[in-house]
Regions:
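Short, surface-exposed linear segments at secondary-structure transitions and domain or protein termini
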Residues: 120-132
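A structural signal for short, hydrophobic beta-strand segments that form beta-sheets
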Residues: 92-96, 119
């Protein structure tokens, strides 16, 4: 049995090739509805754990295994390596490992359990913050310090820009970071019972993010602000419109106003699940890009484009589960989604999350071929 030293090692086998087919300028113009030259198409996440082995048994080439053999049309994203979140993290430690799972101490100091049989995130078994006193003991991990800009981040940012990459910076999630510290249930209660705790967490994170990004954007322009939330299930978001308006939106606006003033054009949020109930609140907070737009949770990019028009761009939106269906079902999904999004622009089409196990390699090949047939047919009409 191989012993892994870091939790990330268990996910290394899922890595896929990400190529660059267009430069940053075309992506930014496309996603802000300034120009619509040709469709954009990508694979956002790649396969679930075990699918590469399934495809290898079905005769996949090495290029199909790492996704480099398939035709896409997408930019390459270049993150600026600065830290706006947890600093001076706890040392990660593997506490227990079996053939089925691993228990570890993660960088938040939590005990977490990670399944080795499925591509899941490590699930926390405890959380460090229950009260304001708990938070105050951890708060220094989120306050500004000069080592947040350690390393040659300026050189990396300039190289990304010169290479035509989309220059990005990431900030902690306004829902996700308190959830990482408290857990979903405790955070839901804290919105009502300890609002000052949630406000202080987000005020602290926001202050640090603004201080870091102020220095970054004085040196190099940033194209896209990125935030990871994963704050919804199929039935809806874990924070409602009121919580977004009261707690999360002020944090978003504070960071986005700085970034927008310095030339950033996109503010993108990564969240699975049904986000319909809070889209309006996030748009008011500055968001203008959402992904991966999960159809099984009710995120229909066709109807959302009709509702929001050019206020909201998308990435993803094609139902990953349909690839396990029939060729006719795949075509029906593509014919419904692709034509209106090619006509309107503002979308990088792709599957809404990892390719599920049981997806035949032949079906993925067919999906790529048919998607391009439809995209090229529609692009000829632009």
């Amino acid at each position: 049995m191989v012993t892994h030293r870091r939790l990330a090692d268990f996910h290394a086998v899922l890595a896929i090739h990400h190529g660059m087919d267009i430069r940053r300028e075309e992506y930014l113009d496309h996603m802000t509805f300034r120009a619509n030259r040709r469709p954009l198409f990508t694979e956002i996440f790649g396969p679930l754990l075990g699918l590469k082995e399934e495809w290898a048994e079905q005769g996949a080439s090495p290029g199909e295994i790492d996704m480099s053999a398939f035709r896409y049309r997408r930019p390459l994203f270049g993150p600026v390596p600065v830290n706006t979140g947890l600093a001076h993290p706890y040392p990660e430690e593997i506490l227990e490992e079996t053939d089925e799972f691993v228990v570890a101490r993660d960088h938040y100091g939590r005990r977490v359990r990670l399944s080795k049989l499925a591509a899941t995130l490590a699930l926390p078994m405890d959380h460090p913050v229950k009260t304001m006193d708990d938070w105050l003991r951890l708060k220094h991990h989120y306050e500004y310090s000069e080592d947040r800009l350690a390393g040659d981040w300026e050189h990396a940012a300039r190289e990304h820009r010169e290479a035509g990459h989309v220059v990005t910076v990431q900030v902690p999630g306004g829902y996700n970071e308190p959830r990482e510290l408290m857990g979903e249930e405790a955070l839901a209660l804290a919105y009502y019972d300890q609002p000052e705790l949630v406000h202080d967490i987000l005020q602290t994170i926001g202050t640090t993010a603004v201080q870091v990004l102020d220095q970054v954007t004085r040196v190099v322009p940033v194209d896209q602000l990125v935030v990871h939330e994963d704050m919804a299930g199929r039935s809806g978001p874990l924070a409602g419109p009121r919580q977004v308006r009261e707690f999360i939106a002020p944090y978003y606006r504070r960071v986005w106003e700085l970034m927008q003033d310095r030339g950033a054009r996109l503010f993108g949020q990564d969240s699975d699940g049904n986000m319909n109930a809070v889209i309006d609140e996030f748009l008011e907070a500055g968001l203008n890009l959402m992904y991966p737009m999960e159809p099984a949770a009710g995120m229909d990019i066709v109807s959302l484009r009709e509702k929001y028009g050019t206020r909201l761009a998308f990435m993803g939106g094609i139902d990953k589960h349909v690839l396990r269906g029939t060729p006719d079902e795949i075509v029906a999904e593509l014919e419904y989604k692709i034509p209106p999004l090619v006509r309107s622009g503002g979308c990088v089409l792709g599957l809404d999350h990892r390719i599920p196990n049981g997806t035949p390699l032949a079906h993925y090949r067919f999906y790529i071929q048919k998607a391009w047939e439809i995209m090229e047919r529609e692009a000829a009409l632009l």
